[in-house]
UniProtKB/Swiss-Prot annotation:
Keywords: Mitochondrion, Ribonucleoprotein, Ribosomal protein. GO terms for cellular component: mitochondrion; ribosome; small ribosomal subunit. One of its GO terms (biological process) is translation. Signal peptide: none annotated. Its main location: mitochondrion. The keyword Ribosomal protein applies. It is found in: Mitochondrion. PROSITE patterns: RIBOSOMAL_S12 (PS00055). It holds the Pfam family Ribosom_S12_S23. This is Small ribosomal subunit protein uS12m.
Length: 140
């Protein structure tokens, strides 16, 4: 049962506001790397994760965010590299709520190994199409 004091207290505080992310209204956004560095994850995990501090332009303001650099192996990111940022946090890195998209702008580093069973996200064509019964195969 709710008391009178709780009712009056709730009115004084008002409703909770929803937090907006920096990418609200945009699926991805172009940005520039300001700093590329490595950090360690939270307690039970141990690794060296690669992250970048990225500046994006929103209307007339510039905002900074920290984005995770996905994938294995080396990357070619440097300060002032142009990158594409998408949403999606890294669960064991506090404050990292965004990811970088590979194969766009200056972030061209491919992974060391070849993925055989999975097509890439973000409109990368399938180069190895299997021939169907009696039909010609077009490789782009």
């Amino acid at each position: 049962m709710i008391t009178i004091n709780q009712i009056t207290d709730r009115k004084a505080r008002g409703p909770k506001k929803k937090r907006k992310t920096l990418l609200t209204g945009y699926p991805q956004k172009k940005g520039y790397c300001m700093r590329v560095y490595e950090t360690k994850p939270k307690k039970p995990n141990s690794a060296i994760r690669k992250v970048a501090k990225v500046t994006i332009k929103l209307k007339n303001k510039r905002k900074n965010l920290i984005a995770y650099i996905p994938g294995f192996g080396p990357h070619n990111l440097q300060p002032l590299s142009t990158v594409l940022v998408k949403g999606g946090r890294c669960q064991d890195l506090p404050g990292v709520k965004y990811r970088l998209v590979r194969k766009h702008y200056d972030f061209l580093a491919a992974e060391r190994f070849v993925r055989k069973n999975r097509r890439s996200k973000f409109s990368v064509k399938n180069l190895e199409t299997k021939a169907k019964k009696g039909k010609a195969v077009r490789i782009e």
